[in-house]
From Swiss-Prot:
GO biological process: tRNA 5'-leader removal
Pfam families: Ribonuclease_P (PF00825)
Listed InterPro entries: Ribosomal_Su5_D2-typ_SF (IPR020568), Ribsml_uS5_D2-typ_fold_subgr (IPR014721), RNase_P (IPR000100), RNase_P_CS (IPR020539)
Enzyme class per UniProt: hydrolase
Keyword Lipid metabolism in annotation: no
Name this polypeptide is given: Ribonuclease P protein component
GO molecular function: 3'-tRNA processing endoribonuclease activity; ribonuclease P activity; tRNA binding
Protein's UniProt keywords contain Ribosomal protein: no
Family: Belongs to the RnpA family.
A Gene Ontology term for the protein's cellular component: ribonuclease P complex
SUPFAM superfamilies listed in its UniProt record: Ribosomal protein S5 domain 2-like (SSF54211)
Amino acid sequence: MLPAPYRLRDRRAFQALYQAGQRRSGAGLILLFQPMPAGCEGIPSQVGLVIGKKVSKSAVKRNRLRRRLREILRPLCPNLKPGYRLLLISKPNLLTYKWPELQAEVHRLLQKADLLVSPSPDPEPS
């Protein structure tokens, strides 16, 4: 589970990201992000995940993917630029990704959006 300050839960924030967020796309994920409203400077970035039924009709598979993404994001949260809201939306082919591919996809999108304070080393395949 992501630490509480890094979780994006507000419905209005999700809607604002869908409507006005900047978009970066990868092969298996879409990243929507935008700065937090004025007065929220210095607050840690918040991350939300969307795993729709297009990914899989099985809730078990969707929840497993959600847990995997959270575990990839957990150590990255302190390295995110403060003051942003992020939303990761999965594409249907993301279920086929192995762990190293999934890590690389998340890192690639965060670097593409220039949201990492210090670039973390590329994940090593295990």
